[in-house]
Amino acid sequence: MDLTAENLGVRRGEDFIFMNISFKLSDGEALVLTGRNGSGKSTLLRTVAGLLRPEQGRVKIAGEGIDAEMRPSEAFHYLGHRNAMKTELTVAENLRFWKDFLGDFPGSTGVAIDEAAAIVGLAGITHLPFGYLSAGQQRRFAMAKLLVAWRPVWILDEPTAALDRAADAMFTDLVKSHLGKGGIVLAATHQPLGLEKAQELQMTGFAGVETWA
């Protein structure tokens, strides 16, 4: 499939945070956003994910299994700074909610909850309340959401911030596997995460200028 952003611009108050942002990604490709704090990286990710409405421009998807009625966000997973998991529910209940709520992209199937737990290195504890877990364990299970409901585009905002090297290595393997299966990754991250060959988009804030590398 193809993910295309055309001339995106987002305003905060009277001023644009950024404008005229365009890019196109196809199967197996990744784009990493760089730039200083406040340059609009998180805002761009949230806009592409459909969580913020752009002042100008649009995001579109095209490819096999995509019809005219499908919203682009139906092809996306968004993993931001928050885990988006209920502390009073068990891990299994949380993952079941996201598996059912998000659903799978047409033609693909997510992995079982127990399998996802094993992949993120935490097999055997999905019966525990999410709130009982350490911060690192909670973050790993938030990453498992990417696995239980299969979607081709991963939008990642500093997904491994403050985690240890083992978690970084685990998530790097997940990202590489996703790209190897033809997935697409759009990320703001200071960690390599298997994205060394990714395209780069430098955000410059109010200047509205982007630089490809």
Swiss-Prot record:
Any one GO cellular component localisation term in the record: plasma membrane
rRNA-binding recorded as keyword: no
Domain ABC transporter: 3-211
Name of protein: Cytochrome c biogenesis ATP-binding export protein CcmA
Family matches, as Pfam families: ABC_tran
GO biological process: cytochrome complex assembly
Chain ranges passing through the membrane: none
Cell compartment(s), UniProt: Cell inner membrane
Function: Part of the ABC transporter complex CcmAB involved in the biogenesis of c-type cytochromes; once thought to export heme, this seems not to be the case, but its exact role is uncertain. Responsible for energy coupling to the transport system.
Assembly description: The complex is composed of two ATP-binding proteins (CcmA) and two transmembrane proteins (CcmB).
Reaction(s) catalysed (UniProt annotation): heme b(in) + ATP + H2O = heme b(out) + ADP + phosphate + H(+)
Classification via PANTHER family: ABC TRANSPORTER I FAMILY MEMBER 1
Family annotation (SUPFAM superfamilies): P-loop containing nucleoside triphosphate hydrolases (SSF52540)
EC number: 7.6.2.5
Family indicated by similarity: Belongs to the ABC transporter superfamily. CcmA exporter (TC 3.A.1.107) family.
Molecular function terms from GO: ABC-type heme transporter activity; ATP binding; ATP hydrolysis activity
InterPro entries in the record: AAA+_ATPase, ABC_transporter-like_ATP-bd, ABC_transporter-like_CS, ABC_transptr_haem_export_CcmA, P-loop_NTPase
Binding residue positions for ATP: 35-42
UniProt KW keywords: ATP-binding, Cell inner membrane, Cell membrane, Cytochrome c-type biogenesis, Membrane, Nucleotide-binding, Translocase, Transport
